[in-house]
UniProtKB/Swiss-Prot annotation:
Molecular function GO labels: 6-phosphofructokinase activity; AMP binding; ATP binding; fructose-6-phosphate binding; identical protein binding; metal ion binding; monosaccharide binding
Annotated EC: 2.7.1.11
Top EC group: transferase
Stated regulation of activity: Allosterically activated by ADP and other diphosphonucleosides, and allosterically inhibited by phosphoenolpyruvate.
Name of the protein this chain belongs to: ATP-dependent 6-phosphofructokinase
Record's subunit section: Homotetramer.
GO biological process, one term: fructose 6-phosphate metabolic process
Catalytic residues identified in the record: 127
Main location: cytoplasm
Binding site for ADP: 21-25, 154, 185-187, 213-215
CDD domains per the UniProt record, alphabetical: Bacterial_PFK
Entry binding sites for Mg(2+): 103
Compartments, record wording: Cytoplasm
Length: 335
């Protein structure tokens, strides 16, 4: 394989630029030509395919977002869209593609492979909801950003003796809420994978204040409900505390990636190129126990929930390849 391309698709994630950089420089070191596909699958169909060299990716490892830009393009799920994209790949002599994104992006990569263009998926999403990898590119940065914001909110929460409901991103996965909640010592962590009773949370808040507690921090995953709705239900259940709600929003998707995300993205990008050089496609790169691994894309993109709650109130990890997490210290809302 002499000529490959790289694209980013779906929601952006810190570390995508580091992955692109690794793909380009590893490919050059292997004697391959590299092209960048701008604006994801939409750009592929439109022919926004341009050559990249080592200088093209200079000084981008520390930048958030993706310099190739990204876009959601549901039309690529249809055969007509796929054939238009493939026509452009053939026009530019592309023989393989590295796709950086989430589960939707992976489906596109699988379609390319089925049409004879080996594609490798790299898990680029802050949600950490891709099966077959302990961590996704961008997750560590998003958790760190959420942690920093929650720490700041804790200061004002304590000053005014308030209860704060803080909504974090994650789509249908509770990973960001879980990790950021543990890291900040949240009083309650509410995630889609675990049930909760509003009256229990109200009782916990009340008991805390009666014992002299100055404030309460509730970290809420967006996949459960909005912070505004949760706050309203909390009041309806009898909460009488001075309540405020905050949605951290897209700040979690931006910013300079952490060292862990930069290294993870660099390792994954380089590994993807090595796979393409061997003619391998239809797989997603992951990390398990700090080692690079490959998994079939289709199964990776279509697995179900990562966590579930047992009848005894314990969280179990459905995906055996997710990183082990110490769950015993979580609050009563998870038990």
């Amino acid at each position: 394989m002499k000529r490959i391309a790289v694209l980013t698709s779906g929601g952006d994630a810190p570390g995508m630029n580091a992955a692109i950089r690794a793909v380009v420089r590893q490919a050059i070191s292997e004697g391959m030509e590299v092209f960048g596909i701008y604006d994801g699958y939409a750009g592929m169909v439109a022919g926004e395919i341009h050559p990249l060299d080592a200088a093209s990716v200079g000084d981008i490892i520390s930048r958030g977002g993706t310099f190739l830009h990204s876009a959601r393009y549901p039309e690529f799920a249809q055969l007509e869209g796929q054939l238009k994209g493939i026509e452009q790949l053939k026009k530019h002599g592309i023989e393989g593609v590295v796709v950086i994104g989430g589960d939707g992006s992976y489906h596109g990569a699988m379609r390319l492979t089925e049409h004879g263009f080996p594609a490798i998926g790299l898990p680029g999403t802050i949600d950490n909801d891709i099966v077959g990898t302990d961590f996704t590119i961008g997750f560590d940065t998003a958790v760190t950003t959420a942690m920093d914001a929650i720490d700041k909110i804790r200061d004002t929460s304590s000053s005014h003796r308030r209860t704060f409901v803080i909504e974090v991103m994650g789509r249908n996965a509770g990973d960001i809420a879980l990790w950021a909640g543990i890291a900040t010592g949240a009083d309650e962590i509410i995630i889609p994978e675990a049930g909760f009773k509003m009256e229990d949370i109200v009782a916990s808040i009340k008991a805390g204040y009666e014992c002299g507690k100055k404030h309460n921090i509730i970290v809420l995953a967006e996949g459960v409900m909005s912070a505004a709705e949760f706050g309203q239900k909390l009041k309806e259940a009898g909460d009488t505390s001075d309540l405020r709600v905050t949605e951290l929003g897209h700040i979690q998707r931006g910013g300079s990636p952490t060292a862990r995300d930069r290294v993870l993205a660099s390792r994954m990008g380089a590994h993807a190129v090595k796979l393409l050089k061997e003619g391998i496609g239809g797989v997603a790169v992951g990390i398990r126990n700090e080692k690079m691994v490959e998994n079939p894309i289709l199964g990776t993109a279509e697995e179900g929930a990562l966590f579930s709650l047992t009848a005894e109130g314990k969280i179990v990890v459905n995906n055996p390849h997710k990183a082990d997490i110490e769950l015993s210290s979580l609050n009563k809302s998870l038990s």
